[in-house]
Amino acid sequence: MEGPQEREVPAAALAAVLKHSSALPFETAQVRGYDFNRGVDYRALLEAFSTTGFQATNFGRAVQQVNAMIEKKLEPLSEDEDQHADLTQSRRPLTGCTIFLGYTSNLISSGIRETIRYLVQHNMVDVLVTTAGGVEEDFIKCLAPTYLGEFSLRGKELRENGINRIGNLLVPNDNYCKFEDWLMPILDQMVLEQNTEGVKWTPSKMIARLGKEINNPESVYYWAQKNHIPVLSPALTDGSLGDMIFFHSYKNPGLVLDIVEDLKLINTQAIFAKRTGMIILGGGMVKHHIANANLMRNGADYAVYINTAQEFDGSDSGARPDEAVSWGKIRMDAQPVKVYADASLVFPLLVAETFAQKVDAFMPEKNED
């Protein structure tokens, strides 16, 4: 027969399970996703990401952060502030927020190239930082296409057939042969101008020259040189471009690329900016090069990272924005965002919710070539 105590729930268990809550701050948002009973409305769907939770909410915060950059960028400068433009060593006018865009080479290999080209075409960003592959793949795509494949294709069979794999993208090796045919005469001309006219080449000057030579409006760097947007690539020799420069050095030696002048260029872009924003797709060199330039001004005002890297191995690629705050690369009062996601999925949606909504404000007479 049960006693009275055996019929009562233990007080400790009740207290643990039914613990009362303190009130949350009044402004705390409620979780709520998109209701498809409203029909298919993509703008409303993306807006609902903010209150969906997880990486959808981080995406919503990234939209807010980029829109804050754009709002400040479009603010008119005072006469005194406008005079700082001469100090940046750039042919671009100073704005209320200088936007740095960094991206790894695989994104140019992918269809994100077209999204980046759109931003550059319409003067929406001020400084680009990428790797060698992020430069050469743009030009190679003007000469021959990249194809869709599968992640699972076997390397041995691809190598036997002269096909290179980038994730689930395929690049025939003939594309690089076409790239060599196009590039070698330009390298000859660069050496000639260096020796006869005293031209001091830097990676950014070389990229601008190649953008002019390709003369193709599908190219990111065609628009970059046309809109005087500097492209910094301190590791420019680490890829097919480096292979071609290496081969060329046997045929016509002497080409010199000065990375120190470019270092001064990117750092002064940050130092003399009224405000700065960083949008960084992927990690590695492009992430750190932009962040380190912003150290020169005690940190960026705005920052958005999009990558899938984790911080637990201590890599810069995986480091959260708060680590950059500790180094003075993002300001202590900033509200940076990291979206843990594949940029090929997220970045076009981010542009759709930010820059693309304000295209007329950036370029009243649209560049369409």
Curated annotation (Swiss-Prot):
Q: Any keyword Phosphoprotein?
A: yes
| UniProt-recorded Gene Ontology molecular function terms | deoxyhypusine synthase activity; identical protein binding
The protein's required cofactor(s) are namely: NAD(+)
**InterPro entries, per database record:** Deoxyhypusine_synthase, Deoxyhypusine_synthase_sf, DHS-like_NAD/FAD-binding_dom
GO cellular component labels = cytoplasm; cytosol
- The active site lies at K329
The UniProt record lists the EC number as 2.5.1.46
| Residues annotated as binding NAD(+) | 105-109, 131-133, 137, 238, 283, 308-309, 342-343
Query: Which positions are annotated as binding spermidine?
Result: E136, E137, D243, H288, G314, S315, D316, E323, A324, V325, S326, W327, G328, K329
* Pathway named in the protein's UniProt entry: Protein modification; eIF5A hypusination
Keyword list (alphabetical) reads:
Hypusine biosynthesis, NAD, Phosphoprotein, Transferase
Phosphoserine modification sites are S78
Q: Quote the Gene3D superfamilies the UniProt record gives.
A: Deoxyhypusine synthase
Protein's name according to its UniProt entry: Deoxyhypusine synthase
Q: Which organism is it from?
A: Bos taurus (Bovine)
Provide the taxonomic classification: Eukaryota, Metazoa, Chordata, Craniata, Vertebrata
Q: Which gene encodes it?
A: DHPS
